[in-house]
Regions:
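Short beta-strand segments
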Residues: 131-133
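Sec/Tat signal peptide C-region and signal peptidase I cleavage site
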Residues: 17-21
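Conserved beta-strand position immediately N-terminal to the Walker
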Residues: 128
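Bacterial N-terminal signal peptides
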Residues: 6-15
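Active-site-proximal alpha-helix that buttresses catalytic centers in soluble enzyme cores
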Residues: 22-125, 136-199
Length: 199
């Protein structure tokens, strides 16, 4: 191998290593909900869910794992307790497209355990999709950033009428074994989804 070929191969190897040495946590709220609550989506939410696979895969690539709350853990909705299936229903079309299971190990309010799972070193080179309740996603995002010494105030408040935002945390390796952590707010671009259910 001549010197030129060796240098090119070395640079390529470094680029591949650098590109893969990052975890990306992609967080989205469940899609639009029924006016009666019910723990369920409405027709617009269903249409958003059906459109999500193309959006998420194009923006972020295939995930290593998908997390949603355990639907058997009940949540109050309009004063009534229901099985909380909105997040799972939102991401199911994406999981089906990818041929992937959905991890529902944690109840909707158990963000402590969810956060610990997301920060497990096994995901250090992974893309993770998390679909959850928006207030809890906002809280967890701030907690993760704080744990790495970042200002939690950079995380905007998640508006109650906002079903389109995507919060993204990237945790990358850097010199000296430290982690470089960044946050960005993205969007699905699906607010104009049809309000009537597909035939």
């Amino acid at each position: 191998m001549n010197l030129h070929t060796y240098i090119v191969a070395l640079l390529f190897s470094i680029l591949i290593t650098t590109a893969s040495a990052a975890e990306k946590i992609v967080m989205l709220r469940h899609a639009e909900k029924s006016a009666k609550g019910l723990g369920q989506l409405n027709c617009q939410g269903l249409n958003r869910a059906l459109a999500l696979p193309n959006i998420l895969i194009k923006k972020f690539g295939n995930p290593s794992v998908i997390y949603t709350p355990n639907p058997s853990v009940r949540k109050k909705d309009q004063g009534q307790l229901y099985n909380y299936i909105r997040p799972l229903a939102t991401i199911e079309p994406t999981a089906i497209r990818l041929g992937m299971p959905v991890n529902t190990a944690f109840g909707f309010d158990d963000i402590k355990s969810l956060k610990e799972a997301l920060l497990n070193p096994i995901y250090s080179n992974s893309v993770i999709y998390v679909v959850w309740e928006h207030h809890l996603l906002e809280t967890m995002t701030r907690e993760i950033l704080s744990s790495f010494g970042k200002d939690p105030k950079i995380v905007p408040q998640w508006d109650g009428n906002d079903f389109d935002s995507i919060y993204v945390i990237t945790i990358a390796d850097s010199k000296g074994g430290h982690k470089k952590v960044s946050f960005m707010k993205d969007s699905e671009g699906l607010d104009n989804a049809q309000t009537s259910c597909p035939n």
